[in-house]
Amino acid sequence: MDTTQVTLIHQILAAADERNLPLWIGGGWAIDARLGRVTRKHDDIDLTFPGERRGELEAMVEMLGGRVTEELDYGFLAEIGDELLDCEPAWWADEAYEIAEAPQGSCPEAAEGVIAGRPVRCNSWEAIIWDYFYYADEVPPVDWPTKHIESYRLACTSLGAEKVEVLRAAFRSRYAA
């Protein structure tokens, strides 16, 4: 288990709790949280945050000794120590926060995962799979590193083949060229 990242995740979430700032774990750590176990080494920590509270997240990162390092078309990157944070906003949509363009329910209010004994909010299985569809548009799956192939397999197995195919069809119809 990568105790450095686990410790940092716990620190980030504790600081966010003090500010009543909801954060969702995304990417590979979301898969691990939903499964309740660490499945691999992670290159970064993906976080989803309320878009209108970005300044609070940035201040919190600075308070934890970090800094924003790069602006991206979907959010920003930050570093705390040697750890990379990949931060993406979610926006309030009637009853819940949602990631833009992701399937509804992308940011569940409840803590639906666990990282080293701590309950955590994490992106939905559907949002995780949706991200892999974007990734497949950028990099053919045959060229994916083994860790991404395995994480995608775990996510698909957890969601179920039928639901994955429904999502894939929705993705294709939305982004058909």
Swiss-Prot record:
Q: What remark does the entry make about the cofactor? A: Binds 2 Mg(2+).
Q: Which parts of the chain span the membrane according to its record?
A: none
The protein's required cofactors: Mg(2+)
The UniProt keyword set, sorted, is: Antibiotic resistance, Magnesium, Metal-binding, Nucleotidyltransferase, Plasmid, Transferase
The answer, when asked if Transferase is one of the entry's keywords, is: yes
Instruction: Tell me any Pfam family this protein matches.
Output: Aminoglyc_resit
Q: Which residues, if any, are the signal sequence?
A: none
Q: Which residues bind Mg(2+) 2?
A: D44, D46, D86
> Catalyzes what?
nucleoside triphosphate + gentamicin = diphosphate + 2''-nucleotidylgentamicin
The protein's matches in InterPro entries, at most eight in alphabetical order, are given as: Aminoglyc_AdlTrfase (IPR019646)
Q: What does this protein do?
A: Mediates bacterial resistance to kanamycin, gentamicin, dibekacin, sisomicin, neomycin and tobramycin by adenylating the 2''-hydroxyl group of these antibiotics.
- The name of this protein is 2''-aminoglycoside nucleotidyltransferase
Show the taxonomic lineage.
Bacteria, Pseudomonadati, Pseudomonadota, Gammaproteobacteria, Enterobacterales
Q: Which gene encodes it?
A: aadB
